[in-house]
A protein has these predicted regions:
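Glycan-recognition and catalytic cores of secretory/periplasmic carbohydrate-active enzymes
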Residues: 1-230
Length: 230
């Protein structure tokens, strides 16, 4: 969906816009869950289609890294295509989805005391500190903090110029600049952290390895924001 919306921006070809709108409608129809008690929006990990065509919604992740959790990055990237489409259409339904998903981030993923956003929450307790989260308990990482900007947040701010999104951008970038660089030990950023922002260099496959693309994302998005907000 993001690709189709971006292709329309580059070419003006209506078939790309049509695809982006249809893709957004599909995501809203098949992958969105509205909590009627809180008004917040969650996005499903996926859905299974049975032999008879029946649909089974999957809220918790089935990926090994995030198994049986709700990972922040899945909620973050659910907004990527729709928000790029919103920049083109101004569809108020998309903006409403974004606002209610950000409410979810602020309520359950955000660490209001020490800053940043937790990487995973439990699907029932909605706590980042639930023991059943295992190695993902009370953790923060590049995805949960830094991916807001490239996935949807800069585009949402450009589309609306609302202070809420500008403040969130500034906060996430300040958090990245404060905690992620590790120049005394590496030219690459530190990517995974414990609750108190101490380094987690023993997690799963990553250990103390760098992801080069994440470093490029940081530089790219810091400069994007710098260009419009010196």
């Amino acid at each position: 969906v993001y690709g189709m919306a971006s292709a329309y921006m580059l070419t003006g070809d209506d078939q790309f816009l049509e695809a982006a709108e249809k893709g957004t409608d599909y995501l809203r129809d098949k992958m969105r869950f509205v909590d009627t008690d809180t008004g917040m929006i969650y996005w499903y990990h996926g859905q299974k289609i049975g032999a008879g065509g029946q649909e089974q919604k999957l809220l918790v992740s089935e990926f090994g890294d995030d198994y049986d959790c709700i990972p922040a990055y899945e909620q973050i990237y659910a907004l990527a295509g729709p928000i790029q489409t919103y920049r083109l259409t101004g569809d108020p339904r998309i903006l409403d989805d974004a606002e209610k998903t950000i409410d979810l981030f602020d309520t359950y993923f955000r660490d209001k005391e020490k800053g940043g956003y937790y990487s995973h929450i439990h699907a029932v307790t909605l706590s980042a500190h639930d023991e059943s989260l295992g190695r993902n308990k009370a953790k923060k990482n590049w995805n949960s903090v830094g991916d807001h900007a490239p996935a949807y947040l800069i585009n949402l701010w450009l589309a609306t110029e609302q202070d809420r999104y500008k403040v969130m951008l500034e906060d996430t970038f300040d958090t990245i600049c404060k905690h992620f660089p590790d120049y005394d030990n590496s030219p690459f950023v530190q990517e995974k952290f414990f609750d108190d922002w101490s380094k987690d260099q023993q997690w799963g496959w990553q250990q103390n390895r760098a992801v080069v693309g994440h470093n490029l994302k940081i530089a790219w998005n810091l400069m994007r924001f710098q260009a419009v907000q010196p």
